[in-house]
Design a protein with these regions (language model features):
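Catalytic cores of secreted or luminal carbohydrate-active enzymes
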Residues: 183, 191-206
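A metal-dependent hydrolase metal-coordination microenvironment
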Residues: 2-127, 131, 138-140, 145-147, ...
Length: 206
């Protein structure tokens, strides 16, 4: 029988979550509590991506835990009665937190506005990921209008638990079939407690 390795045989692999929220925005746990919780579950890397709040929690870093600095931005579309009927959420994660420059966090749902924000964020030192398009009421063909995303959330466990809308395989398939490049990631989008869903990273950024 031939042994097949799902993970790289001779490389270091880190367990990471690239999307979570603390009491700095609408999360239920402090940044310190999140660190303790994720470390207890075997995580090495945690991206703090609070809504419209960019902070680098450098003091939380230690030999076995790396906090990533980031934030989540949203772009909203409302109907005539001011009800939200479509949104686009993106995560910006700093490559070098000491050099990255955040931009304004809120915007309207227009393709050119979103693409411009992604472009500026990349120029300012961030990788930019598209969050939970199914939950955001974005169809697979709609995401093809966007450019510059480093990755798409293939799965978001918070959206699955709350609205059964966390799976985004069709969006990623459409993305690849259109010739666009991007990684697939899974995240728990934690607002309260950790779901044991590892994201295994060979390298954080390319």
């Amino acid at each position: 029988m031939t042994r097949e390795y799902i993970l790289p045989e001779n490389e270091t692999v880190y367990k990471a979550n690239l999307h979570c929220h603390s009491t700095c925005s609408d999360g239920a746990m402090s940044t310190e509590e999140l660190k303790a919780l994720y470390k207890s579950k075997g995580y090495n890397v945690l991206a703090y991506t609070d809504h419209h709040t960019y902070r680098y929690h450098k003091d939380l870093a230690d030999e076995t835990f790396l906090p990533l600095a980031g934030y989540e931005l949203n772009f909203d579309k409302f109907d005539s009665k001011r009800r939200l009927n479509k949104t686009c959420h993106i995560n910006a994660i700093a490559i070098d937190p000491d050099k990255a420059i955040p931009i304004e966090g809120k915007g309207i749902y227009k393709v050119d506005v979103i693409n411009d924000a992604v472009k500026r964020l990349r120029e300012n030192g961030f990788v930019v990921n598209l969050n939970h398009p199914s939950w955001s009421n974005q169809g697979p063909e709609e995401v093809l209008q966007f450019d510059g995303f480093t990755a798409i959330e293939l799965y978001n466990s918070c959206c699955t638990r709350t609205y059964n809308s966390g799976e985004n395989q069709s969006h990623y398939d459409a993305w690849l079939k259109a010739g666009k490049k991007g990684f697939a990631i899974a995240a728990d989008d934690n607002h309260a407690s950790c779901n044991e869903l590892p994201v295994l990273c060979r390298r954080l950024f390319s």
